């Protein structure tokens, strides 16, 4: 890639009304791909996540991860002049993304029907827990609410215990990625038709889309089959799950055509003749017995890596179950910039995830930056609305423009780690 090559979405402008994770993930991806993302922050505290993660000198690691590659516009929308400024920007905006509860953005005066009259080419994406329509749409919700409504939470955990909650924002991040994909498709459609459109993304829909197997099975066999939690084993494939080894755990999967390789690695090829293990269906029914056999073999190795080496020699699909810090230090992850090192003037050097897809024309950016609240007010308003220095000064004096705020360090001591439940 040469320095002169334009970034993929260069020239597209995004107005970002998002907060927490799902919405910011969508707009952050657009920003990474070159769009000019203008994040609207409506108070000196800004996005709630500015107070989460490690906070130092007005910057939060949580905020940085989900909001780099954006410019911050601090504006008080309770003041009529603040709303007027943003409405005046709409003709020059390509994409608007928001993740308020359904109806809130319209109540603020920025609903799609109103904005499309100002700019028919506008692509607008709303992200919520359960969508903009339907009986559940007005319920408040976060990531885990979408998972529960989609029938996903019930499938997680041990069969004789309560369902579990993953300690990561799977639904938020996945919905943000899906929304960014949809925005890209809508922009492509606009290039062909000249018209924008409205996109309705939800955590519930994204979670439901993740069901691998059981949706058509349940609909074809109503009342005859009920998926059950299966703990660390896959409910419909065997062997497929987490197995205990000396000094750790191994994720191991062997489909029918791979079973001979697994049994060769184990030195027990005759097990294929055992009726309990001859087919996938029989192995699923006898999962506990097969697990005992596999873990008994794994116990003969001095450590996990030795067992994996034996499996690798037969090309049996397997992997060590790595702790997060082990994954972050893995040379493969570093080499692909799946883990990438960035720098902030307050936080110093630290790691964030890379892009989920690698592009041949230009690599993941590492010179990314996150803005303080209102840091880019003057530049944004001069570029888009040609606001004069005199008028900018008046807007600050009237409290319409907000600048200099950050996560409240009186509430969050510098360097502390503060975590809240994942919120869409």
Predicted regions, residues:
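A glycine-rich dinucleotide-binding beta-alpha-beta segment and adjacent secondary-structure elements
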Residues: 313-366
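Substrate-binding/catalytic subdomain of NAD(P)-dependent oxidoreductase enzymes
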Residues: 187-230
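A short glycine-threonine-serine/GTX helix/turn-capping micro-motif
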Residues: 163-174, 196-198, 229-240, 249-251, ...
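N-terminal helix-loop segment corresponding to the beta1-alpha1 unit
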Residues: 1-192, 219, 225-226, 372, ...
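C-terminal active-site "lid" helix and adjoining low-complexity regulatory extension at the edge
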Residues: 350-389
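Glycine-rich beta-alpha junction loops
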Residues: 44, 129-131, 203-208, 247-249, ...
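Beta-strand segments within the central parallel beta-sheet cores of soluble alpha/beta enzyme folds
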Residues: 196-204, 310, 392-396
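Aromatic-enriched alpha-helical interface/lid elements that frame and gate functional surfaces
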Residues: 225, 233, 239-314, 318
């Amino acid at each position: 890639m040469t320095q002169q090559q334009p970034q993929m979405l260069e020239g597209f402008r995004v107005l970002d009304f998002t907060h927490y994770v799902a919405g910011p993930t969508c707009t952050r991806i657009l920003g990474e791909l070159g769009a000019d993302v203008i994040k609207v922050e409506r108070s000196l505290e800004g996005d709630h996540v500015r107070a989460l993660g490690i906070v130092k000198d007005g910057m939060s690691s949580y905020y940085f991860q989900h909001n780099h590659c954006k410019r911050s516009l601090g504006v008080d929308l309770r003041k009529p002049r603040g709303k007027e400024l943003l409405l005046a920007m709409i003709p020059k905006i390509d994409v608007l993304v928001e993740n308020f509860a359904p109806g809130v953005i319209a109540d603020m005066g920025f609903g799609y029907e109103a904005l499309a009259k100002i700019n028919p080419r506008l692509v607008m994406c709303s992200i919520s827990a359960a969508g903009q329509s339907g009986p559940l749409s007005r319920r408040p919700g976060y990531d885990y609410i979408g998972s529960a409504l989609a029938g996903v939470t019930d499938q997680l955990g041990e069969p004789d215990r309560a369902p579990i909650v993953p300690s990561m924002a799977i639904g938020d991040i996945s919905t943000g990625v899906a929304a960014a994909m949809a925005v890209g498709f809508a922009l492509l459609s606009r290039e062909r038709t000249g018209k924008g459109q409205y996109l309705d993304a939800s955590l519930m829909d994204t979670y439901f889309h993740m069901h691998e197997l059981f949706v058509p099975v349940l609909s074809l066999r109503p009342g005859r089959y009920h998926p059950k939690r299966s703990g660390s084993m896959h409910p419909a494939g065997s062997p497929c799950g987490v197995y205990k080894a000396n000094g750790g755990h191994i994720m191991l999967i062997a489909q029918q055509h791979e079973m001979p390789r697994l049994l060769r690695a184990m030195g027990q090829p005759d097990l294929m003749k055992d009726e309990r293990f001859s087919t996938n269906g029989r192995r699923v029914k006898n999962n506990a017995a097969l697990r005992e056999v596999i873990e008994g073999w794994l116990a003969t190795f001095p450590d996990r890596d030795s067992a994996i080496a034996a499996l690798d020699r037969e090309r049996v699909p397997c992997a060590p179950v790595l702790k997060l810090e082990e994954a972050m230090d893995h040379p493969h992850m570093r080499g692909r910039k799946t883990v990438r090192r960035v720098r902030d003037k307050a936080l110093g050097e630290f790691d964030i995830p890379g892009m989920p897809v690698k592009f041949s024309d230009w690599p993941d950016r590492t010179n990314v930056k996150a803005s303080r609240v209102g840091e880019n007010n003057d530049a944004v308003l001069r570029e888009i609305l040609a606001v004069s220095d005199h008028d900018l000064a008046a807007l600050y004096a009237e409290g319409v423009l907000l600048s200099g705020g950050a996560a409240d360090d009186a509430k969050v001591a510098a360097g502390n780690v503060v975590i809240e439940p994942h919120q869409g």
